[in-house]
Amino acid sequence: MLTLLEKFIQKIEEYNLIEENDRILVAVSGGVDSSVLLNLLARVQEYFKFSIFCATVDHGIRKESKEEVKFVYNMAQSLNVECFIKEFDVPLYAKENKLSIEEAARKLRYKFLNEIAKKINANKVATAHNLNDLAETVLFRLARGTGPFGIYGMKPRNGNIIRPLLFFERKEIEQFATENKIPFVVDKTNFDTKYTRNFIRHKIIPIFKEINPLFEQAVLRFVENVWELDSFVKDKLNVETFEFEGRIFFKVPKDEYILVEFIRRKTMEHFGRAPDKEKLDRLKKNLYKTSFKISFWGDYGVEISYGYGVLGKFIEHMNYECSMDCQNNVNFGPFVVKFGNNGIIFKKMNLTIRNYRFGDKTKGGKKLKEIFVEKKVPSFIRRIIPIFVDEDGYVFYIPNVFLDRDYLSKEENGISIKVEMKGGFWF
């Protein structure tokens, strides 16, 4: 049977959690889990050849926290690990931002960890979540009605976050601490069942363990199956995308399930929260429409039109107008207007580039609105695409949409115009 240290090394290698020359910032509270994690990483540091740093936080919730911060600092010093300390007033932050104490503490803690990681060029942050934490998270999210791919909440590796203790039960970790004389502090609030996670830990999980004494292992088997399914689905989400100024432009996949899952994942990945089921159900019900938009919260959501979509802050009508000297490149949102070679050559004129306006028409009298509908130009693109007009205000060119050939020049000394959409994405 493997020792905890041997199993620790095995899981690091199996999930590729640590690589040579990594710079790892370890989040340490002083509790048994994080104290053991710091000590384990110090023991395998020479084996994997990486650098360790430590960060600890005084949340300003308990009187004992100042002493606990000192404890962590001294432990880090004994292991020759540099330690960073931060104090927060979590109760005040929670009140000001209408958050629970748990959520406020988590937000501030991760903000600090990311700041320190950036400061010291740490490419990974290690947290001490264990198998019991995973089981508690699954039950908590199940109680809230979370979907299948959000239920596990944590993986051995999420971006730059690694969780080397995720496969170990708390009792294993406590036993290792005792056998190896690793000091740790006990946070008394961990026993206060007014906090949701503690209520699940001390009241709910014991009931499940009466049904199955190996409940945590059963949860792990379930979660590992979800991880595999999650990877399979992720491989299927090969949706063509282009990102610009915090928005994600994409071609709408034909499969409804792939579209909804793509939107759910991208929203979570970029904005830190996923749309609730009611919003995603509304999305599915509107798919028969040519154009529509669904708000997920405030002015953030998804807009779909003629087989294309944009995810993020809704695109407002851009208001711009400029007369061109036809020499320098100009940016209009995601569009770049280039003058010079390899473009469409127009007759020399005093041209203006601006946004679409109600009533715009061509020299032949056709309204732009009709052209947009005929060419199936997405509604959100209409608000931002550059419109080329002559000195009389007639539209003669809309890239990829309309071209009045009467304005083309047969001479090489005309005006050469080429319009590109950043990212190589075209509707």
Curated annotation (Swiss-Prot):
Q: Which InterPro entries match?
A: Lysidine-tRNA-synth_C, Rossmann-like_a/b/a_fold, TilS/TtcA_N, tRNA_Ile_lys_synt, tRNA_Ile_lys_synt_N
Q: Which CDD domains match?
A: TilS_N
UniProt catalytic activity: cytidine(34) in tRNA(Ile2) + L-lysine + ATP = lysidine(34) in tRNA(Ile2) + AMP + diphosphate + H(+)
In this chain, ATP is annotated as bound at S29, G30, G31, V32, D33, S34
Q: What is its EC number?
A: 6.3.4.19
Pfam (any one) = TilS_C
Q: Which GO terms describe its biological process?
A: tRNA modification
Domain of life, source organism? Bacteria
Can you name one GO molecular function term for this protein? ATP binding
Record localization = Cytoplasm
Top EC class, one word:
ligase
Q: Which GO terms describe its cellular component?
A: cytoplasm
Stored SMART domains? TilS_C
UniProtKB keywords? ATP-binding, Cytoplasm, Ligase, Nucleotide-binding, tRNA processing
Keyword Cell cycle attached: no
Q: What is the recorded function of this protein according to its Swiss-Prot or TrEMBL entry? A: Ligates lysine onto the cytidine present at position 34 of the AUA codon-specific tRNA(Ile) that contains the anticodon CAU, in an ATP-dependent manner. Cytidine is converted to lysidine, thus changing the amino acid specificity of the tRNA from methionine to isoleucine.
Q: Which family does it belong to?
A: Belongs to the tRNA(Ile)-lysidine synthase family.
Q: What is the UniProt domain comment for this protein?
A: The N-terminal region contains the highly conserved SGGXDS motif, predicted to be a P-loop motif involved in ATP binding.
Matching PANTHER family, A to Z? TRNA(ILE)-LYSIDINE SYNTHASE-RELATED
User: Which NCBIfam families does the UniProt record give?
Assistant: lysidine_TilS_C (TIGR02433), lysidine_TilS_N (TIGR02432)
Q: What is this protein called?
A: tRNA(Ile)-lysidine synthase
> From which source organism is this entry?
Thermosipho africanus (strain TCF52B)
